[in-house]
Amino acid sequence: MTQMPASDVPGMGRRQFMNLLTFGSVTGVALGALYPVANYFIPPRAAGGGGGTSAKDELGNSVTASGWLSSHAEGDRSLVQGLKGDPTYLIVEGVDAIGSYGINAICTHLGCVVPWNSGANKFMCPCHGSQYDATGKVVRGPAPLSLALANVSVDNDNVFVSQWTETDFRTGEKPWWS
């Protein structure tokens, strides 16, 4: 191969250098701004071996089955952060058993958080008086639909909440929320 003398090699002019620098800066800023937008459309990865989202307590800590069962009595329904950050009731079914389903606490009428009323043994919406039985089935309107369900699983003492895709056992129909 022959080498070209240095005088024959074209150099990068000041204008070309500034154009390259400007293009690189604008591209970097555009990619930085588009990353969160693109990331929004990518579904979150499943956590844990059983899949789903790790249930979080009111402080944002992951819920463990042993810790939850030691501080909650049988029949208790208490809120955790579930799918998409929605408040979800975990149900204690026995001394050492968390229920296989959770109940989304968002009212199907106007989206209020529905508290559990242990005295009446039902969920009662404070906004417009809708009532749901212990399984989240609507028993009194104006709410048109039952509360959404979520699968609850325990894997290595960690509690996970995942999308409910089975038939709604309360109505025998396909879930309205999936």
Swiss-Prot record:
Q: Which SUPFAM superfamilies match?
A: ISP domain (SSF50022)
Biological process GO annotation list? photosynthesis
Q: List the disulfide bonds.
A: C112-C127
TM helices/strands, residue ranges: 20-42
Please list the GO terms describing molecular function. Answer: 2 iron, 2 sulfur cluster binding; electron transporter, transferring electrons within cytochrome b6/f complex of photosystem II activity; metal ion binding; monooxygenase activity; oxidoreductase activity, acting on paired donors, with incorporation or reduction of molecular oxygen; plastoquinol--plastocyanin reductase activity
Instruction: Quote the record's binding site residues for [2Fe-2S] cluster.
Output: C107, H109, C125, H128
HAMAP family with a match to the protein in the record: Cytb6_f_Rieske
Extra notes?
The Rieske iron-sulfur protein is a high potential 2Fe-2S protein.
What's the protein here called?
Answer: Cytochrome b6-f complex iron-sulfur subunit
Mind giving the lineage of the organism this protein is from?
Answer: Bacteria, Bacillati, Cyanobacteriota, Cyanophyceae, Synechococcales
Gene that specifies this protein: petC
